Amino acid sequence: MMIYISGAISNNPNYQSEFQKAEQWLMLKDYTPVNPARFITNLPKLTEEQIMKIDYCLLELCDGIFMLGGWQKSKGACAELSYAKSLDKKVLYQKYYERGQDNE
């Protein structure tokens, strides 16, 4: 199952580390993580609108979305969650998984 990782990137100096930790955790749980932070780093300077178009395309390919802690503070992460729900994607929240719960 492919899972898109969503969380705050702008104004978050630790985003690379947070996304990588989520990626590793998802792999341990036998998910195939899709880490948009890896793509952003390797792309030329893009507008926020261009980045969101890429993110939506990646999200469409996935079976679900994994919401990192603090996602509510990110306009982009909120938009990704809304889009994922409109596509009936499975939604996983980091805070529940940290407590050992397996679902929303």
Predicted regions located by residue number:
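Conserved catalytic or regulatory cores that recognize and/or transform ribose-phosphate-containing ligands
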Residues: M1-E104
